[in-house]
Amino acid sequence: MSEFLPFSRPALGDAELAAVGDVLRSGWITTGPKCAQLEQAFCQLTGNRHAIAVSSATGGMHVTLMALGLGPGDEVITPSLTWVSTLNMICLLGAEPIMIDVDRDTLMVTPALIEAAITPRTRAIVPVHYAGAPADIDAIRALGERYGIPVIEDAAHAAGTAYKGRHVGAAGTAIFSFHAIKNMTCAEGGMVVTDDDALAQRIRSLKFHGLAVDAFDRTMQGRAPQAEVITPGYKYNLADINAAIALVQLEKLTQHNARRAALAQRYLHGLADTPFLPLVPPAWEHHHAWHLFIIRVDERWCGIDRDGLMQALKECGIGTGLHFRAAHTQRYYRERFPDMVLPATEWNSVRMCSLPLFPSMNDDDVERVITALRAIAKV
């Protein structure tokens, strides 16, 4: 049997090892100069005035929503078809998640679905840039401006994604992930970008205990200003060990995303005459980062359901992923919102399957997956 082909594998090499070694030898391994360099480099990528490195996108979402002043009685609009961390953070702040449906084929929230969910208690809108493609952010931001509601972009899938010629997050506020399977990784980490000066200052404080300065600031500036708590905060700072890896990954991002795109095109060509349905690219101008390659598996057409397909591929030595099981179908949210019905989300949630996609895959790996899928579907 062939070697197991995982759903994802981080693209790490000698440059990342050397970067970590440099940090270890420097004597400064926590938040420091590498983190500052990463923030500057990310500002150059997205064009934002501020980039705040955090220990995870989840932590970044937490302190960003907290910096907006979210609390009991407030509502946040976001899709159910997302990773549960966003919903969890909303609930942990005492606010109410208002989960909405998505377009059935792009899996993006739409301005119409968002507007229908707005109430006098809406305090934030969190659209998701899904699988490497961007949501229609101009239209969504226009809604936010019309109603006076901040838009916080979930860009966890969108490092390298462009919308109408500009990187996702440009001129707004967005949160990126550097988790192990993302297009750029440092094992765990994330970045908040924003052009809002006051919001950036609050996020910087909240991600480090609520202090006005961190340990590196105090080393560079001495004891003035004093490390004084402005408001109770958390510890979501990113260590220089992680930042050093992320800096190397950022340098490789364009090359890695180009390889992802080439692999995705091979999938699209090889599966074009099969019953497996890929996602439909958004109609607006964009550059796809191809974080995920997703197919939808309908038993009526494929002769097998999604779970059966994933098991059959596993028996062929091929790994798969699920992005995502709808949040409102999970026990806590199902019990909290028992009457919630989101037809397009639910249809996709039980049919979607993420195929292997990572830069070090070769063309034969893709052909192996396509051959297995065609054999399973008997086409």
From Swiss-Prot:
InterPro entries: ArnB_NH2Trfase, DegT/StrS_aminotransferase, PyrdxlP-dep_Trfase, PyrdxlP-dep_Trfase_major, PyrdxlP-dep_Trfase_small. It catalyses: UDP-4-amino-4-deoxy-beta-L-arabinose + 2-oxoglutarate = UDP-beta-L-threo-pentopyranos-4-ulose + L-glutamate. Its EC number is 2.6.1.87. Transmembrane segments: none annotated. It is an enzyme of class 2 (transferase). The keyword Lipid metabolism applies. One of its GO terms (molecular function) is UDP-4-amino-4-deoxy-L-arabinose aminotransferase. Pfam families: DegT_DnrJ_EryC1. Catalyzes the conversion of UDP-4-keto-arabinose (UDP-Ara4O) to UDP-4-amino-4-deoxy-L-arabinose (UDP-L-Ara4N). The modified arabinose is attached to lipid A and is required for resistance to polymyxin and cationic antimicrobial peptides. Belongs to the DegT/DnrJ/EryC1 family. ArnB subfamily. This is UDP-4-amino-4-deoxy-L-arabinose--oxoglutarate aminotransferase.
